[in-house]
Amino acid sequence: MEWEWSYVFFSAIIILPAFILFFSQKNTTKSSYKFPPGPPGLPIFGNMFELGTEPYKKMAVLRQKYGPVLWLKLGSTYTMVVQTAQASEELFKNHDISFANRVIPDVNQAHSYYQGSLAIAPYGPFWRFQRRICTIEMFVHKKISETEPVRRKCVDNMLKWIEKEANSAEKGSGIEVTRFVFLASFNMLGNLILSKDLADLESEEASEFFIAMKRINEWSGIANVSDIFPFLKKFDLQSLRKKMARDMGKAVEIMSMFLKEREEERKKGTEKGKDFLDVLLEFQGTGKDEPAKLSEHEIKIFVLEMFLAGTETTSSSVEWALTELLRHPEAMAKVKTEISQAIEPNRKFEDSDIENLPYMQAVLKESLRLHPPLPFLIPRETIQDTKFMGYDVPKDTQVLVNAWAIGRDPECWDDPMSFKPERFLGSKIDVKGQHYGLIPFGAGRRMCVGLPLGHRMMHFALGSLLREFEWELPDGVSPKSINMDGSMGVTARKRDSLKVIPKKA
């Protein structure tokens, strides 16, 4: 969240009188509250310039001084940050509903995206309906098991693409594996939702959709001055809403084409089989606690969000896990040995192998502990004035859960900064939101609804990569010289993408 000074100072000069009036009124209103502790910050700007490019790390450092709950003022936005497993448990167990609303970023005003979004929808009946239909139609165990052939096809293609890229690469140089994991995840969702490959560069419409979705992810991950000074929204100083409107518009336009194609297929009776798009098109509800029918706009946004949520998290998580294994050759040797002993020669990695690979499961848990795909869970917002751990949290306060700091909480984890998959062997700790020191996908009512499918795909992709290839670092790169800095966006990817040399096992 590194802010560009020119935007902020220009904004302040234009509306300084409004700032003064606004803050004087706000401070008078809130002077009686007992807020959590936090650094004092600058007039007007608050703490926004103290956080750097990896704010989750800076906030974790502040935990040592201010404790498990941190209070910040980011421009005109009051923010509470939850930073320990104890505070996380208190929030999700005892205050989940009070903190169940979402902050709506300004870029998500484009094409009224927020109105059909499951991730940032207000807590209420429509959100509950969305979550219910996703769970029943895509993410229950039976449905996920039925999608194994789709995952198999997409991962097989990924392995072919990697081998082809490696064969054409200059000797001693590496390739970016995460790009191929992203493509495989994108195609998996394309097949489950729309019954087509969407990372197919031979298809013009698929290629355009893929590019538009990549750009939407990019604009969503840039810190926006309009979100910390909401009364600047109409100026769109960074042109982020304009860019989002352009690329969201392109994605929506292509989705309209997909819907039209599906309508024609249904009329002709040439459908390949029922997918999630059919479920949405055929839905008929009561009109009470759920819509009687989904509008075309709601269907488009519903589908777009599935792609946005399900691709970056999988590819970044696999990249971090492979990075940690390359940094720790002894762990790489252990997981490779486990896989070779569990799977007979000349057989591909399969879904059913995952349960027989406890060390590989531990590797992914440990990597997710150290590198959660969203270092801050999607920001929450208080529905009402709330007492939390003895502090006052006013209605409409932004609430950040620092999953990165919680995964490194020394009161929860022994030697928290070290990569030790062995800590999970024989342990019942998992990432499903019941162990509050390990919440890479959230917890409570608003935890990631797609976790069951995404979690399966992470294991399947990583296991297949380890089964099919031996992995080496490029010339001049040693395990300890790998840059472990993250980049702050929709997800916390490696700042420098991992480059590796795959050799057919």
Curated annotation (Swiss-Prot):
Entry GO MF terms: heme binding; iron ion binding; monooxygenase activity; oxidoreductase activity, acting on paired donors, with incorporation or reduction of molecular oxygen
InterPro entries cross-referenced by the UniProt entry: Cyt_P450, Cyt_P450_CS, Cyt_P450_E_grp-I, Cyt_P450_sf
CDD domains, A to Z: CYP76-like (cd11073)
UniProt binding sites for heme: C448
Recorded superkingdom: Eukaryota
Swiss-Prot/TrEMBL keywords: Heme, Iron, Metal-binding, Monooxygenase, Oxidoreductase
CC cofactor: heme
Broadest EC class assigned to this enzyme: oxidoreductase
Keyword Heme on entry: yes
Keyword ATP-binding (UniProt): no
E.C. designation(s): 1.14.-.-
Cited PROSITE patterns: CYTOCHROME_P450
UniProt similarity note: Belongs to the cytochrome P450 family.
Protein name: Cytochrome P450 76A2
Gene that encodes it: CYP76A2
